[in-house]
């Protein structure tokens, strides 16, 4: 009370603090930014403090900013406390450069300040902007970017910028401007670890990142366990001592008294000594002033001591007395131009102003200013080097420019004037001609027909003169001449005689008779006004004019055509029967050449196509859709030499198809009608008969095409011509596809914010807060953002009492997600046979570590034929048949079954190998049975539309049902791929920046062609995407993967992984299965023992480009090990592996692959079974 009364007597009371009182003085930046383990792109790790998570950021565009309320409080505290302190525990990647803290705004590309750890320069940079001008302070030799944990404290307070690591001061400089007083909140955002560009994002781990507002750095260090040293009480004037401790910024090592020289030659220049003397003069003035101030303090202390009768002890009030004035606790005042003081717990703590190094050689002191200053005239060259020589002229002809430059010695001068000068130069006129490619002129009119009757030709020409190629320009492409047929009236055809028929038998055998022969006017018949044949139709001739002998042969005892031999005694004998007959010469019967020589005519395993005649034979014409000869003859010699050859017609090979010039003719086989189909080439779309440009390679043309009647398939204009969307979904029917429509349902809410993108709901009600609007939520009162509906009844699984719709409630259903009304459970493990991955072995946990759909309990991985099915579950254990096709369901696969349809007709003679038809009916005789005509596997899908015509289990490309296989399923954070299904499973979009994973379909293949369109719809990230084939388990598969840029994987354990840009083809045969070993091996371009082997990598190392459509095509023939990968960019082949041979796996499943890449479109997917 006495001390308070004394103060009141002096007229000094406690002073009210100015400004609003802010309770919180420490802010956890992770907490107020809502950064947690669920934040996309933030991976959680264990740091030095086990109770608090550490984070590594890999997707900086997803880092949330500090919330607005807390940012407002931070800015107010920074102004009130004259700055702030940033504390953190960090482990920065070696030699990396990264931002610790940044305040962006108020504009989209503006910043107010940022703290950047510059590993290459080994500095900690503070950049801030005042009135649009950038200022930079940096602390040197900080040693932060060495991949070691550091506990740092950054001081940005009053006029000081310093760094403490642990309890040690590393470096400190003086701030030029109190920028923290001008910070703005409106339209501003504060981020942790996020830089202004990709190169300035923080690379490493962060923990315990706080903004602290304290009175001094000692308060913060003491809370970290640091011991107080004398440095904490520097510049303190105590009431109990008359000694002033100078700060380390003021050195007293230099003595100006006369001393003996330590060496004969001075190592300092006169200019340096002059600067030193100027600084000492200023220091002398400062020390004298401080000495006088100390004397006044001692006098004032003595006065107060006498006034109050000795030191008082009080707990309620503290104050300081200086030069007769009493100052309240924490009050700050100015002593002189170089000194400020603050009252701290009865002590007066004074701080010296530290001057920045002079920027000129001869600084001067100004009255009232603490620090020396520099002045320059505007036209002075002080500090500049001499001008360099002029550069060469920037052009080789015409008017150009030259430049020269000079440099500034910034260590001691502030140079005025430009550093670069520019002047114009001229080297004569330029040749105005330009390189010009040739162009065709218009076509000339068609010439007259080359004939006056019948079929001829007309011709037209064009010249390469519009313009003529010059200066190395290219010649015109294409032909300068074009010809087409012309039709005139048919020409007259004069009739001509056929050959004479054989002479008829003579009317008598001797003494003269008559024989005749005839001819017909049909070779050709007269047509179109032609002349008739001239001459007689019949001709007669005398025969057997000789006298009649007495001869036994005169009575013609032999078979006509057989030679008769007579003898003098009147007897006779007959020679052999004529060709085409069998007998003794007297009696001859027709020889059936068709029965003796069975392969005369082409056979289709049906009725004989050879017709026996009397005499001779002939073959029926070739069956429909075959072409060949039609032989005929008499006798065995003709039968053995004249064979009928019928070959299947192939319009693609014969060039008789009607496909467009930019389409490919695909031969379907002679059993199909039609025998071919037309598909537009890559870069084009249409029905094959008409093809147009297709920029995004999704199978739809840029413009409408005039296709054949009722043939609108892929002839309609693409509703998203620059973004692949093979399904062409357009919910609001506005002509803009959903893929590129910003508001699919036209409810005035953009798709990005719409919680029902495909349903009009402007009110956006969402009762269960699952980000799916009530109008389209299949469980509107139950949180279920995935919207899974197993039985497709409109009620989501999350709120359905019977998920699979088998009339068995979930709590009693042993297969709640698989329809099984019988609830059969052979092994009694509580899991129904329909969904049990070991139906004959008790395994209630259903663990399947290798993701091959066989539970670990019964998985032995013994597979002698490498087709992905272990021996005890393989229906052909010794013959590779990945598809396990068994069309007669007899337990024996078609690959090892001699009668696939069990109709009693062996496969090699069965005209419908997969369909039961013991009668083998074949109406048109083409070798294909009627029952499987145009649908070989009898799956009700015509072969021309069937992607697997010989497998009734696969009819179309469909990835709507797939198995999600995470390849690195463990870790502190796990981001799985997010697959969006479109176009009935023919288009999938992966939206997340995820860990490696596969979406693998359930259809299984041996020989297969697999193609699709690849498109990355973002400019964020640059990592892997591709597809898999021959998938047998998560340890055994082939993968084609494509990286945009070369990059080392950020986790170097368990093995360092270097990923090179370009397309790679790899075979995975992992001994460890999914996890970090397989993850790093997949990233690595090369071989990793026991994990991955690279079969091919594109030597051009071409990475994919953002917003660019590519088309891949895979060919795989497991029987020979042949595989080939082609990648098109537009119409051109960008990468081609050529023939690659590997027989590690004999087939498997197909799927899509991603590794740390978001917004990947897999569009217009297509797989087709092929003959081995």
Swiss-Prot record:
Acidic residues biased stretches: 739-749, 847-866, 896-905
Sugar-bearing residue positions: 151, 316, 330, 457, 584, 710, 1069
Gene Ontology CC terms: basement membrane; extracellular matrix; extracellular region; platelet alpha granule
Complexes and interactors: Homotrimer; disulfide-linked. Can bind to fibrinogen, fibronectin, laminin and type V collagen. Interacts (via the TSP type I repeats) with CD36; the interaction conveys an antiangiogenic effect. Interacts (via the TSP type I repeats) with HRG; the interaction blocks the antiangiogenic effect of THBS2 with CD36. Can bind to fibrinogen, fibronectin, laminin.
Chain segments annotated as transmembrane: none
Biased composition (Polar residues): 870-884
Domain VWFC: from-to ranges: 318-375
GO biological process, one term: negative regulation of angiogenesis
TSP type-3 repeat placement: 693-728, 729-764, 765-787, 788-823, 824-846, 847-884, 885-920, 921-956
One Pfam short name: VWC
Example of a GO MF term: heparin binding
Protein name: Thrombospondin-2
Intervals of motif Cell attachment site: 928-930
Organism: Mus musculus
Region (Heparin-binding): 19-232
Residues annotated as domain TSP type-1: 381-431, 437-492, 494-549
Domain (EGF-like): residue spans on this chain: 549-589, 648-692
Gene field: Thbs2
Family: Belongs to the thrombospondin family.
Biased composition (Basic and acidic residues): 885-895, 925-935
Function noted in UniProt: Adhesive glycoprotein that mediates cell-to-cell and cell-to-matrix interactions. Ligand for CD36 mediating antiangiogenic properties.
Signal peptide annotation: 1-18
Disulfide partners: 393-425, 397-430, 408-415, 449-486, 453-491, 464-476, 506-543, 510-548, 521-533, 553-564, 558-574, 577-588, 594-610, 601-619, 622-646, 652-665, 659-678, 680-691, 707-715, 720-740, 756-776, 779-799, 815-835, 838-858, 876-896, 912-932, 948-1169
Domain annotation TSP C-terminal: ranges: 960-1172
Keywords: Calcium, Cell adhesion, Disulfide bond, EGF-like domain, Glycoprotein, Heparin-binding, Repeat, Signal
Region of interest: Disordered: 727-752, 846-938
């Amino acid at each position: 009370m006495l001390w308070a009364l004394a103060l009141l007597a002096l007229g000094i009371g406690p002073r009210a603090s100015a400004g609003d009182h802010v309770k919180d003085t420490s802010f956890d930046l992770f907490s107020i930014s809502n950064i947690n383990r669920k934040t996309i792109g933030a991976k959680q790790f264990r740091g030095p403090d086990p109770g608090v998570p550490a984070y590594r950021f890999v997707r900086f565009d997803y880092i949330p900013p500090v919330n607005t309320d807390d940012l407002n409080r931070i800015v107010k505290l920074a102004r009130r406390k004259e700055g702030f302190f940033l504390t953190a525990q960090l482990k920065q990647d070696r030699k990396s450069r990264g931002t610790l803290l940044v305040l962006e705004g108020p504009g989209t590309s503006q910043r107010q300040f940022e703290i950047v750890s510059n590993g290459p320069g080994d500095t900690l940079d503070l950049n801030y902007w005042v009135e649009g001008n950038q200022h930079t302070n940096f602390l040197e030799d900080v040693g932060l970017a060495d991949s070691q944990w550091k506990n740092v404290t950054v001081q940005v307070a009053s006029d000081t910028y310093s760094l403490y690591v642990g309890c040690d001061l590393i470096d400190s400089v003086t701030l030029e401007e109190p920028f923290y007083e001008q910070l703005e909140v409106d339209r501003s955002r504060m981020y942790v670890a996020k830089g202004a560009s990709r190169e300035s994002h923080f690379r490493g781990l962060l923990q315990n990142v706080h903004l602290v507002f304290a009175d001094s750095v000692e308060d913060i260090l003491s809370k970290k366990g640091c011991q107080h040293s004398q440095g904490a009480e520097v510049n303190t004037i105590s009431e109990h001592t008359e000694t002033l401790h100078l700060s380390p910024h003021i050195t007293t090592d230099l003595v100006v008294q006369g001393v003996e020289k330590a060496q004969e030659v001075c190592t300092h220049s006169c200019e340096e000594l002059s600067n030193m003397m100027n600084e000492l003069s200023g220091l002398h003035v400062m020390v004298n002033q401080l000495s006088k101030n100390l004397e006044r303090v001692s006098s004032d202390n003595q006065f107060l001591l006498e006034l109050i009768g000795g030191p008082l002890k009080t707990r309620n009030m503290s104050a300081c007395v200086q030069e007769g004035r009493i100052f309240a606790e924490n009050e700050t005042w100015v002593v002189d131009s170089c000194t400020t003081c603050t009252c701290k717990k009865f002590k007066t703590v004074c701080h010296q102003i530290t001057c920045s190094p002079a920027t000129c050689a001869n600084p001067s002191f100004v009255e009232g200013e603490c620090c020396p200053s520099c002045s320059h005239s505007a036209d002075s060259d002080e500090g500049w080097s001499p001008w360099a020589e002029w550069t060469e002229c920037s052009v080789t002809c015409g008017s150009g420019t030259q430049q020269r430059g000079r440099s500034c010695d910034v260590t001691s001068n502030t140079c005025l004037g430009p550093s670069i000068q520019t002047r114009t130069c001229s080297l004569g006129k330029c040749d105005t001609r330009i390189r010009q490619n040739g162009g065709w002129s218009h076509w000339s009119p068609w010439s007259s027909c080359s004939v006056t009757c019948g079929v001829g030709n007309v011709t037209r020409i064009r010249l390469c003169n519009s313009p003529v190629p010059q200066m190395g320009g290219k010649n015109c492409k294409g032909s300068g001449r074009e010809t087409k047929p012309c039709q005139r009236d048919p020409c007259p055809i004069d009739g001509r005689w056929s050959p004479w028929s054989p002479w008829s038998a003579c009317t008598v055998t001797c003494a003269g008779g008559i024989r005749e022969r005839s001819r017909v006017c049909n070779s050709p018949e007269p047509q179109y006004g032609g002349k008739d044949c001239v001459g007689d139709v019949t001709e007669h001739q005398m025969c057997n004019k000789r006298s009649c002998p007495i001869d036994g042969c005169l009575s013609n005892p032999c078979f006509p055509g057989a030679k008769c031999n007579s003898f003098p005694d009147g007897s006779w004998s007959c020679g052999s029967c004529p060709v085409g007959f069998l007998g003794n010469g007297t009696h001859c019967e027709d020889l059936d050449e068709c029965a003796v020589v069975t392969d005369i005519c082409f056979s289709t395993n049906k009725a004989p196509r050879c017709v026996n005649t009397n005499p001779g034979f002939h073959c029926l014409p070739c069956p429909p859709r075959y072409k060949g000869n039609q032989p005929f003859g008499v006798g065995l010699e003709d039968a053995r030499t004249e064979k009928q050859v019928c070959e299947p017609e192939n319009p693609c090979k014969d060039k008789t198809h009607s496909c467009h010039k930019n389409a490919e003719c695909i031969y379907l086989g002679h059993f199909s009608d039609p025998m071919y189909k037309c598909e537009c080439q890559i870069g084009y779309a249409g029905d094959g008969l008409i093809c147009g440009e297709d920029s995004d390679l999704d199978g739809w043309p840029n413009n409408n095409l005039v296709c054949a009647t009722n043939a609108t398939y892929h002839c309609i204009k693409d509703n998203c011509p620059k973004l692949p969307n093979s399904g062409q979904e357009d919910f609001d029917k506005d002509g803009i596809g959903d893929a590129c429509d910003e508001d699919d349902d036209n409810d005035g809410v953009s798709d990005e914010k719409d919680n029902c993108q495909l349903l009009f709901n402007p009110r956006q009600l969402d009762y269960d807060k699952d980000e799916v609007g009530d109008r389209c939520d299949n469980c509107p009162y139950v949180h279920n953002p995935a919207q899974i509906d197993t039985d497709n009844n409109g009620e989501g699984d999350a709120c359905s009492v019977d998920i699979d719709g088998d009339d068995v409630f979930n709590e009693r259903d042993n297969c709640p997600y698989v329809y099984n009304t019988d609830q059969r459970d052979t092994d009694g493990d509580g899991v129904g046979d329909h969904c049990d991955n070991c139906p004959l072995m008790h395994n209630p946990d259903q663990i399947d570590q290798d993701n091959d759909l066989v539970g670990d309990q019964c998985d032995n991985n013994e597979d002698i034929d490498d087709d992905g099915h272990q021996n005890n579950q393989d229906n052909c254990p010794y013959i590779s048949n990945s598809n396990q096709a068994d069309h007669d369901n007899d337990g024996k696969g078609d690959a090892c079954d001699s009668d696939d349809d069990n109709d009693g007709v062996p496969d090699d003679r069965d005209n419908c190998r997969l369909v039961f038809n013991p009668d083998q009916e074949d109406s048109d005789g083409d070798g294909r049975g009627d029952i499987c005509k145009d649908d070989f596997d009898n799956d009700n899908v015509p072969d021309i539309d069937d992607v697997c015509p010989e497998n009734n289990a696969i009819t179309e490309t469909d990835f709507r049902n797939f198995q999600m296989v995470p390849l690195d399923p463990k870790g502190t954070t796990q981001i799985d791929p997010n697959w969006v299904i479109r176009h009935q499973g023919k288009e999938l979009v992966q939206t997340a920046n995820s860990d490696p994973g596969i979406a693998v379909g359930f259809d299984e293949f041996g020989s297969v062609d697999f193609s699709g369109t690849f498109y990355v719809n973002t400019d964020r990230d640059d990592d892997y995407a591709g597809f898999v084939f021959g998938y047998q388990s998560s340890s055994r598969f082939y993968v084609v993967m494509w990286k945009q840029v070369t990059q080392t994987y950020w986790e170097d354990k368990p093995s360092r992984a270097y990923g090179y840009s370009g397309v790679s083809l790899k075979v995975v045969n992992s001994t460890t299965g999914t996890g970090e070993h397989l993850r790093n091996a997949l990233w690595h371009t090369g071989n990793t023992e026991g994990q991955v082997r690279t079969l091919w990598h594109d030597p051009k190392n071409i990475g994919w480009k953002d917003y660019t459509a590519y088309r891949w095509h895979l060919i795989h023939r497991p029987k020979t090990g042949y595989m080939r990968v082609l990648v098109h960019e537009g119409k051109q082949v960008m990468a081609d592996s050529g023939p690659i041979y590997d027989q590690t796996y004999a087939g498997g499943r197909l799927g899509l692959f991603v590794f740390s890449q978001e917004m990947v479109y897999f569009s217009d997917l297509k797989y087709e079974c092929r003959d081995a």
